[in-house]
Amino acid sequence: MKKNKKNYDIQDRLLFNLFLDSAARISAIYSLKISQLNLDENLFENVREKEGYIVSIIFFNETKELIKEWLKIRETNKITNEFFFVTYYDGTYKQMTKETIRNRIKKIGKIINIDDFYPHSIRKTIINIISNIGNITDGAILANHKNSKVTSEHYIKHQKQNDIKNRLIDLRAKAGL
């Protein structure tokens, strides 16, 4: 996502990128702390997720550069709150709420003409892409699912019957049937 300060700020860009890079759940992103950040490894470590699982939240180099920029802004503005995402309210910086995170992502959706755009929309999309390019196991690993059954049932876009038929025709032709 390119810089456009008129429509969104660095925390918007970081939220979008982290959801896209990691396919993390909102509860994980919401709970990120500065102390969990490992810039050398491009991840947040020991993040509590759904059902108490501890996971790593990965990110890539573009996001790493945004994080460095955000850390400088935090230092300049003397933001000492332990949470990575913060809002300024009533004269102090506080942990950004899940609702604020949802609203920020929804705002990005409106910019690109998608009305029902939420953090989970990004999660489902990237899991679908990875599962289609790689395989269902890759999608399950990215999603931090216990097994690929959950990924298959709830995250993977199901193919249309015509697509399945065409794929079977191709496979049969390759097999000489």
Each language-model region and where it sits:
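Basic, Lys/Arg- and aromatic-enriched nucleic-acid-binding interface segment
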Residues: 1-26
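Short, charged phosphate-coordinating catalytic segments
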Residues: 19-41
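Short, polar N-cap/turn motifs at the start of nucleic acid-interacting alpha helices
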Residues: 37-39, 135-154
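Basic, alpha-helical nucleic-acid-contacting "clamp/cap" segments
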Residues: 40-41, 49-90
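DNA/chromatin major-groove-contacting recognition/catalytic segments
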Residues: 141, 153-177
